[in-house]
């Protein structure tokens, strides 16, 4: 399931940057 959460977290971090 982590594989589905990592991309979401990466997207949030990229959005904040």
UniProtKB/Swiss-Prot annotation:
It is found in: Secreted; Target cell membrane. Signal peptide: none annotated. Keywords: Amidation, Amphibian defense peptide, Antibiotic, Antimicrobial, Immunity, Innate immunity, Membrane, Secreted, Target cell membrane, Target membrane. The keyword Membrane applies. Expressed by the skin glands. The keyword Hydrolase does not apply. Transmembrane segments: none annotated. The modification Leucine amide is found at residue 17. One of its GO terms (cellular component) is other organism cell membrane. GO terms for biological process: defense response to bacterium; innate immune response. It comes from the Eukaryota. Shows more potent growth inhibitory activity against the Gram-positive bacteria S.aureus (MIC=50 uM) than against the Gram-negative bacteria E.coli (MIC=150 uM). Has a weak hemolytic activity against human erythrocytes (LC(50)=135 uM). Belongs to the frog skin active peptide (FSAP) family. Alyteserin-2 subfamily. This is Alyteserin-2b.
